[in-house]
């Protein structure tokens, strides 16, 4: 079953600021996650226990998403450089209950 991709409004702004190259890299990984969003190794903890991450190692970027199994939605809540965990702090503020 394939999930539907949604963006938090602030995450969409962050997405649009990315270079086309980074967008393409994330698109490729997101396409796989839409088929199987619950990747154990990518699961976050603490305040973000309902979220998962996608990492672009060389670029140093992170994408944090939340999964709603009832509605079959993968919601991108934040993305950006890992710089001092700012992307994770943004994700904490934007999570849906």
Language-model segment annotations:
Residues 31-56:
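A short, surface-exposed loop/turn module that caps and links secondary-structure elements
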Residues 17, 33, 66:
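Conserved catalytic core of Hanks-type protein kinase domains
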Residues 2-4, 13, 58-62, 66-97:
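Enriched for short, Lys/Arg-rich terminal
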